[in-house]
């Protein structure tokens, strides 16, 4: 399993940057996790969009879905040019709510919508995927994702505050992609559906994850500052997200 960081910034992309998006590849599947602003421009460095097997959306906040409409339009054009069969729309797996967002996911013959929740398990190629609702604070659902293939486990934490029930879902993951939206110095007084870098590191350590990728960072953050606040994670390699970073499991 190979994970490529296509975007990691939030709430907006910095110069030459992109908000969240991760390409996950195995021998038989190519999946995009979230599709934020600038993600498609990065995806093209590794894969034509018409070779994607599925798109999984954690939730509908703009920084995670900004490029979805462009992806839909691009796939439609590639179908017109016979680069992707018209009878092979791209499945988009995403929450049902807000309904206005999920209803926009089917687009001509290019894309179809498939609902996700904690009761659903899907298979894409050799990947088995399950979901966990996270503590993201504003009432609309957000789902973490657990991807399993060839004995390896990737957990994408999406957006999450401190009250997500990770036990039994992320324990011992080979890689935990965990948000660290805030540094110590800009942490809000009350939790608002996000974690600090320090909290992300402590969480991964408590869960016994084999490696950690800290993401969902302001474009202005200096990587060495992020790294210094992640030192509580000692169980394995700690990666700080950057565009183009690839991790093999």
Task: Pin down the residues of each PLM region.
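Metal-dependent catalytic neighborhoods of phosphoester/phosphodiester hydrolases
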Residues: 67-75, 101-104, 222-230
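Acidic/polar short surface loop at catalytic or gating sites that assists cofactor/ion binding
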Residues: 73-113
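Cap/insert and terminal regions of metallo-dependent hydrolase folds
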Residues: 162-245
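Active-site metal-binding motif and surrounding structural segment of the metallo-beta-lactamase
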Residues: 38-88
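A short helix->loop->beta-strand "cap" motif at the edges of active sites that frequently abuts
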Residues: 29, 83-90, 207-211, 236
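Short acidic-hydrophobic, aromatic-tinged amphipathic segments that line or gate anion-handling sites
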Residues: 113-117, 240-241
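Core dinuclear metal-dependent hydrolase active-site scaffold
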Residues: 1-46, 115-168, 246-249
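Active-site neighborhood of phospho(di)ester-bond hydrolases with catalytic His/Asp-centered motifs
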Residues: 32-36, 53-60, 94-95, 154-160, ...
């Amino acid at each position: 399993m190979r994970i490529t960081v296509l975007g990691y910034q939030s709430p907006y992309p910095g110069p030459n940057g992109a908000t969240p998006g991760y390409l996950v590849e195995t021998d038989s599947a190519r999946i995009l996790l979230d599709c934020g602003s600038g993600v498609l421009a990065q995806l093209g460095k590794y894969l034509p969009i018409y070779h994607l097997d599925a798109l999984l959306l954690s939730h509908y906040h703009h920084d995670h879905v900004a490029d979805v409409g462009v992806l839909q339009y691009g796939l439609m054009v590639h179908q017109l040019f016979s680069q992707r069969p018209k009878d092979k729309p791209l499945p988009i797996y995403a929450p049902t709510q807000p309904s206005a967002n999920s209803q926009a996911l089917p687009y001509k013959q290019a894309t179809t919508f498939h609902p996700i929740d904690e009761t659903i398990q899907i298979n894409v190629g050799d990947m088995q995927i399950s979901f966990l609702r996270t503590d993201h604070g504003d009432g609309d659902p957000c789902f973490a994702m657990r991807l399993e293939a060839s004995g390896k486990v990737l957990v994408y934490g999406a957006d999450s505050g401190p009250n997500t029930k990770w036990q039994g879902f992320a324990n011992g993951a080979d890689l935990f992609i965990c948000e660290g939206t805030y540094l110590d110095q800009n942490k809000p007084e009350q939790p608002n559906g996000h974690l600090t870098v320090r909290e992300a590191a402590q969480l991964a350590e408590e869960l016994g994850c084999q490696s950690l990728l800290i993401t969902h960072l302001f474009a202005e953050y200096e990587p060495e500052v992020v790294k210094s606040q992640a030192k509580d994670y000692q169980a394995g390699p700690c990666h700080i997200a950057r565009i183009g970073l690839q991790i093999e499991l």
